[in-house]
Amino acid sequence: MNTRAKAPEETTVVVGMSGGVDSSVTAYLLKQQGYNVIGIFMKNWDDTDENGFCTATEDYEDVIAVANQIGIPYYAVNFEKEYWDKVFTYFLDEYKLGRTPNPDVMCNKEIKFKAFLDHAMRLGADFVATGHYARAVYEDGEHKLLRGVDTNKDQTYFLNQLSQDQIAKAMFPIGHMEKSEVRKIAEEANLATAKKKDSTGICFIGERNFKQFLSQYLPAQPGEMRTLDGKTMGRHDGLMYYTMGQRHGLGIGGDGEPWFVVGKNLQDNILFVEQGFHNELLYSEGLYASDISWTATMPAGTEFRCTAKFRYRQTDTPVTVRVLDGGRLDVAFDERQRAITPGQAVVFYDGDVCLGGATIDDAYKAGQALTYLA
């Protein structure tokens, strides 16, 4: 059922406002279009830094400034407990398994389009809106998630876990725009955030050193760094600090090509490294994935063709997907891929339509798993 039939003046939209330019323009455009707009600032993390400065305070002040400029009510809502339980705990659990998680995917699924969506519905909202570069449309009896028009900013990779019900209640007013156009609108409207820099990185780490941050929550277990033929190359600081294909921070000197992480032995706490960017051990023919979520109807049959991304801003890769027993997928690549990373998302597309995604368990070549080596 298409839920977008009411006139704007009869429709209440709650906008997730972060204090950035994208969500500011989102609220501004909806107000200009005649919607009843409410701005909500989500406080998901106690992000006071070592000097006692809380970046959320500055961000909320920017939300207040923009909300007052465009004439909408605003509130702050605390989702710290939900974020800890659903996102941060998952983040730590994945690192314990030697994987590299993507908390942004989980945050969208569990916080922005669940806890926040539920809160908005209790306020009487018809929709929630965010400043994501994506599009939500109703076609052929389904609510579909489409890529943002700005291919460099498209964020469907991070929205791959959204369900039909979540997409049905979502609005992405800047999804049909280029980033430069969004900035221009903000500047012409003289919004307080018009010249504010985009935030980058994981929200709860911010500008802090990643190793120092993670070590506050997980005890590091240093161990041996070896080649696959058993030559010791040094010591690692803890397997959780390293990801497939990583080059920097290994501390291996000498002549010749750089060294890269090619695998882990979790049981014996060994990090495997080999030399050369194009080392064969970094390339795989496919991957196994689990925790599958389809944004729309799952493609028919137990095998289908589509394209996929294995990291944000990657060019789409043609793949063949086979549905295995036990809720797993076998994703075979048309062309070999480098440094596939367990814990990250594999996201599937049919043209501009995001079909859904899953969590990468491991990569394989000639039927042999590559990452977790005994």
Swiss-Prot record:
Active site: C107, C203
GO cellular component term of the entry, any: cytoplasm
Alphabetical keyword list: ATP-binding, Cytoplasm, Disulfide bond, Nucleotide-binding, RNA-binding, Transferase, tRNA processing, tRNA-binding
Record-linked InterPro entries: MnmA-like, MnmA-like_C, MnmA-like_central, MnmA-like_central_sf, Rossmann-like_a/b/a_fold
Main location: cytoplasm
Catalyzed chemical reaction(s): S-sulfanyl-L-cysteinyl-[protein] + uridine(34) in tRNA + AH2 + ATP = 2-thiouridine(34) in tRNA + L-cysteinyl-[protein] + A + AMP + diphosphate + H(+)
Record-marked site positions (Interaction with tRNA): H132, Q344
Residues reported in the UniProt entry to bind ATP: G16, M17, S18, G19, G20, V21, D22, S23, M42, G131
Interaction with target base in tRNA: region residues: 102-104
Function: Catalyzes the 2-thiolation of uridine at the wobble position (U34) of tRNA, leading to the formation of s(2)U34.
Descriptive protein name: tRNA-specific 2-thiouridylase MnmA
Gene designation: mnmA
